[in-house]
């Protein structure tokens, strides 16, 4: 039985007792500043075989949503800081399986979060899909996200969901230092991310992307863990080393592979995608900090349902699907991120998530996006 049928018939877990799609109204959301893209259901996307057997979590029967039900709609509007190339196929499948008209406004995570804050109660968004916990926390802090059902939250380990039950991680991503293996020896990578500063070995050989949401979340983590002065000094120090500025992580990875730079600060999965596309070994590796260093931050891409959603039941059904085995396998196998649903294994080329020993940091503490943006502006990086 397809997941859409479970919803319509009031089947298992979170879907029990929902009057979701059978009695939906088709009211359009209010006008949006930038028209979202409608994901055409029917494209279809079947995940490839899992590297190893993966068991789906068992939902709690009879769980009911804690989001207030309003006039419901089969149209769900998502503000997505995740790119269309990464999650478009998955959202197409979800729309098809759930019988939803999924409309997506793609953009920069921080900019979309700001747009939601500016739109306030007029926002047409039902669901925010951010590429980092910082933006989700910023929306939660401003009261824009509704509490999520415990049944959904409990599918994800506690470190990767909101301590206030306002957002939930969908996939994990790890900050790494990518380096060119033909020009850099592994032992040359500093023992801490902060030790790059003042090291002339790296002058004009580093790459970073200060406008990237994941980088900004890392800066927030550095502020929380080491303080404002250390974070400012690190930014100023890397800038003083004439680090090359890139628009995004993928550009840093490509430049490292090509030998244009020797190392850069990125998320782990970009190199794996380049390898998959190339179909051959590449002269680059990821250095994982496994000593609790801020440079080894494990962040999440996650979702939250807006308090103003006019389709909150449908939005929750979408979250339910994102935390199902098929969707989690998609993230493991197609985007090379860490699945967060218990029983679904990461790609075999990745170190196990439990072995990474990330910094002891509550991801809910990454909510001061405004402070990080202000700091980046002050040091001339924005």
Predicted regions, residues:
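A bilobed periplasmic-binding-protein/Venus flytrap-type ligand-binding module shared by bacterial periplasmic
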Residues: 176-183, 298-311, 330
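Periplasmic-binding protein-like
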Residues: 204-209, 321-344
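An extracytoplasmic/periplasmic, membrane-proximal ligand-sensing/linker region
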Residues: 229-231, 337-382
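Extracytoplasmic/periplasmic substrate-binding proteins
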Residues: 247-308, 342-348
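Extracytoplasmic ligand-binding site segments that recognize negatively charged/polar headgroups
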Residues: 73, 80-88, 107-111, 117, ...
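Short, polar/charged alpha-helical segment
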Residues: 67, 77-101, 177
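N-terminal export signals
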Residues: 5-25
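Ser/Thr-rich, Proline-interspersed low-complexity disordered segments
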Residues: 27-72
């Amino acid at each position: 039985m397809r997941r859409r049928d479970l919803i319509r018939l009031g089947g298992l877990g979170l879907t029990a007792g929902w009057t979701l799609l059978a009695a939906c109204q088709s009211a359009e959301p209010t006008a949006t500043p930038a028209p979202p893209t409608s994901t055409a259901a029917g494209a279809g996307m079947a995940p490839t075989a899992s590297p190893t057997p993966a068991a789906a979590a068992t939902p709690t029967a009879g769980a009911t949503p804690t989001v207030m039900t309003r006039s419901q709609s089969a149209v769900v509007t998502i503000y997505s800081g995740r790119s269309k190339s990464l999650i478009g196929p998955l959202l197409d499948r979800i729309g098809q399986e759930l019988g939803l008209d999924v409309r997506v406004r793609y953009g920069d995570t921080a900019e979309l979060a700001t747009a939601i804050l500016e739109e306030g109660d007029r926002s047409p968004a039902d669901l925010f899909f951010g590429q980092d916990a910082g933006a989700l926390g910023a929306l939660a802090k401003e009261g824009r996200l509704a509490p999520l059902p415990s049944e959904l939250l409990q599918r994800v380990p506690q470190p990767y969901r909101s301590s206030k039950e306002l957002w939930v991680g969908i996939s994990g991503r790890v900050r790494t230092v990518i380096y060119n293996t033909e020009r850099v020896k592994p032992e040359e990578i500093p023992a801490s991310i902060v030790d790059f500063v003042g090291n002339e070995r790296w002058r004009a050989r580093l790459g970073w992307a200060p406008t990237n949401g994941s980088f900004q979340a890392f800066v927030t983590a550095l502020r929380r863990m080491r303080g404002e002065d250390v974070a400012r000094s690190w930014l100023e120090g890397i800038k003083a080393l004439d680090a090359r500025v890139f628009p995004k992580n993928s550009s840093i990875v490509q430049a490292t592979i090509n030998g244009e730079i020797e190392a850069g600060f990125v998320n782990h999965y970009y190199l794996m995608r380049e390898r998959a596309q190339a179909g051959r070994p590449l002269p680059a590796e990821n250095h994982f900090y496994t000593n609790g260093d801020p440079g080894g931050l494990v962040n999440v891409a996650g979702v939250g349902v807006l308090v103003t959603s006019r389709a909150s039941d449908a939005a929750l059904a979408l979250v339910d699907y994102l935390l199902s085995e098929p969707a989690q396998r998609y993230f493991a196998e197609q985007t090379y991120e860490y699945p967060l649903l218990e029983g679904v294994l990461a790609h075999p080329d990745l170190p196990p998530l439990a072995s990474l020993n990330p910094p002891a940091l509550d991801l809910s503490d990454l909510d001061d996006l405004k402070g990080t943006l202000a700091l980046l502006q002050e040091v001339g990086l924005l």
